[in-house]
Design a protein with these regions (language model features):
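Non-catalytic, soluble scaffold/interaction modules
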Residues: 1-204
Length: 204
């Protein structure tokens, strides 16, 4: 507070010396205190397809870092996603129905308030839900178009806002050849995609 740099900054920005520094005091919640505690991340809409459905993952008895670190395999939030992935573990919707119902309600409120698809971080401590953070979620070009169109239909945003929300630069990803999602296929490997589109042929 009394360093030369701090004093200069206050002088430039017209900040009085008598104000002093401020401190944020926040409650710490723990998702790693037992089997009735979880931590997770979720989107209010599917960030890949734009479908209006909760999409996300959670870990039992874990902290936030564990969900994204890749050291443990997270479980799906919804029963539908868990079933589609043939997951053995129960979804949060099945294992914590009351918490899931509450989470779904607050997620909807956040999306309506911010008028955009939300990326939410949450923790459940001893079966009590804590919403930690929310922000506008990143999405694919396909999802961006669907979400924008759907939100106009839902009267959340105007047509002008919808057009402005679709970045022209990402539309290029829609022009690449892709695999038919409905086609029958034999899965030989799984992984995380690093680029848009699909290709076939001999790798040399």
């Amino acid at each position: 507070w009394n360093s030369k740099r701090a004093k200069k900054y206050r002088k430039i920005n017209y900040i009085p010396d008598h104000w002093g520094t401020s401190v944020n005091v926040q409650t710490m919640v723990f998702g790693n205190m037992g089997e009735n505690c979880v931590t997770g991340v979720a989107f209010t809409r599917n960030p890949s397809t734009g479908e209006k459905e909760l999409f996300g993952e959670y870990l039992i008895n874990a902290q936030g870092e564990d969900v994204v670190a890749g050291t443990r395999t997270p479980q799906y939030i919804t029963k539908k996603a868990s079933k589609e992935a043939n997951a053995k573990e129960l979804s949060m919707e099945e294992s914590m129905p009351k918490v899931f119902k509450e989470f779904k309600k607050f997620s909807k409120k956040l999306e309506i308030h911010y008028r955009d698809m939300q990326d939410i971080e949450f923790t459940v401590e001893n079966n009590k839900l804590w919403m930690l953070q929310t922000r506008s979620g990143k999405r694919t070009a396909k999802a961006a178009i669907k979400i924008a169109v759907d939100m106009v239909k839902e009267k959340l945003i105007s047509t002008k806002e919808a057009v402005l929300r679709v970045d022209p630069n990402i539309l290029d990803t829609l022009l690449h050849p892709t695999l038919d999602e409905k086609a029958e296929k034999k899965i030989i490997a799984t992984g995380l995609p690093a680029s848009p589109g699909a290709a076939s042929g001999k790798v040399t």
